[in-house]
Amino acid sequence: MTLDQHNTRTEGYFIAKDGDRELGRMYYSWAGIDKFIIQHTEVNEEAKGTGAGKFLVESGVKYARENNFKIIPRCPFASAMFKKHKDDWKDVLEE
């Protein structure tokens, strides 16, 4: 699985891909200069169960760590992932 990221000053998204095939997207918006809100995560029907959703949220966590950002997980899927990985991801969680 590979990742593309598109980012503007106000919002952005990650795309999970398998070759040229898009598997899913995770959308975020900026909440200041050092934190972003995960708004929505979606996985294409044929990619469900492949780990694409987890890959997208993990990619957001990696991006936050590399840039000293915090994450506000408003998306239900991302929020559930943060609860599941609360000890591992608490360093990037905005509380």
List each language-model region with its residue ranges:
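Short beta-strand micro-motifs enriched in acidic
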Residues: 6, 29-31
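Conserved acetyl-CoA pyrophosphate-binding loop and the N-cap/start of the following alpha-helix
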Residues: 47, 51-56
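C-terminal structural segments of small proteins and small subunits
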Residues: 63-95
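Aromatic/hydrophobic pocket-lining residues that form π-stacking "cages" and hydrophobic walls in ligand
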Residues: 60
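Active-site rim helix/loop that mediates acceptor-substrate recognition in acyltransferases
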Residues: 1-13
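Conserved beta-hairpin
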Residues: 12-23
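Conserved beta-strand in the GNAT
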Residues: 21-29, 37
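Conserved acetyl-CoA binding element of GNAT-fold acetyltransferases
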Residues: 34-45
